[in-house]
């Protein structure tokens, strides 16, 4: 039997890996950071060199990369991704948490993927006003994998796709947890704190409010396939 000599391929070898971008989107409390951590640890088990980058201004859970339930991982804090490009070039897998806060996220991820890195980004897709958060959505057409997670609505316990701000701040970047934000469903997004629907013609809500917030209109009457008298006539005939 003849033997075939296979080349020695080491995990993380720049000449053997194929770059890609994976994007994890969703509202707050949907498990984005948890999923990012799971994927990075999966590569670590396979002996890949990994680097996690976190937003430097988010100091809620010390300098570590942390999920809301306090699972932590070593991370490199940064405000601009170009400031850590040398560290990123020394690894095979790059995880980026709170990707929506980095203004150079698209350029960085594309360059790293083109150089053979696997880049995994966890980010909010929308602001508290349900508008695109920074340039993060520009990653979608560049990514090999995109997933949007949902949370549990913190007001009615249904599926939640949006982030609702509890305070009155108007600026987009306000870092906080459950003290400042709720994950909410479509209906609860448009409710005021009192539980009443938002006013349709208010300047703050008119752009995002649906056309109707009351009870959905009843569907027109459906014609029955077999009326009662039709069934009775058939019985008499038999």
Curated annotation (Swiss-Prot):
Q: What does UniProt say on post-translational modification here?
A: Phosphorylated on Ser-13 in mitosis. Phosphorylation of Ser-13 by CDK1 during mitosis reduces homotetramerization and catalytic efficiency when DNA replication is complete and intracellular TK1 is still present at a high level.
Keywords annotated in UniProt: Acetylation, ATP-binding, Cytoplasm, DNA synthesis, Kinase, Metal-binding, Nucleotide-binding, Phosphoprotein, Transferase, Ubl conjugation, Zinc
* PROSITE patterns the record matches: TK_CELLULAR_TYPE (PS00603)
Q: Which InterPro entries match?
A: P-loop_NTPase, Thymidine_kinase, Thymidine_kinase_CS
MF annotations from Gene Ontology: ATP binding; thymidine kinase activity; zinc ion binding
Q: Where are the catalytic residues?
A: 98 (proton acceptor)
Coiled-coil regions, chain positions: none
Nucleotide-binding is among the record's keywords: yes
PTM-bearing positions, type N-acetylserine? 2
- Catalytic activity from the UniProt record: thymidine + ATP = dTMP + ADP + H(+)
Q: Name one GO biological process term.
A: DNA biosynthetic process
Query: Any keyword Oxidoreductase?
Result: no
EC nos:
2.7.1.21
Q: Where is this motif: KEN box?
A: 206-208
Q: Where are the Phosphoserine residues found in this chain?
A: 2, 13, 235
| Annotated signal peptide | none
Recite the other comments.
Answer: Two forms have been identified in animal cells, one in cytosol and one in mitochondria. Activity of the cytosolic enzyme is high in proliferating cells and peaks during the S-phase of the cell cycle; it is very low in resting cells.
Notes concerning its domains: KEN box sequence located in the C-terminal region is required for its mitotic degradation by the APC/C-FZR1 ubiquitin ligase and interaction capability with FZR1.
Record note on quaternary structure? Homotetramer. Tetramerization from dimerization is induced by ATP and increases catalytic efficiency due to a high affinity for thymidine. Tetramerization is inhibited by phosphorylation at Ser-13. Interacts (via the KEN box) with FZR1.
* Protein name (database record): Thymidine kinase, cytosolic
What organism is listed for this UniProt entry?
Bos taurus (Bovine)
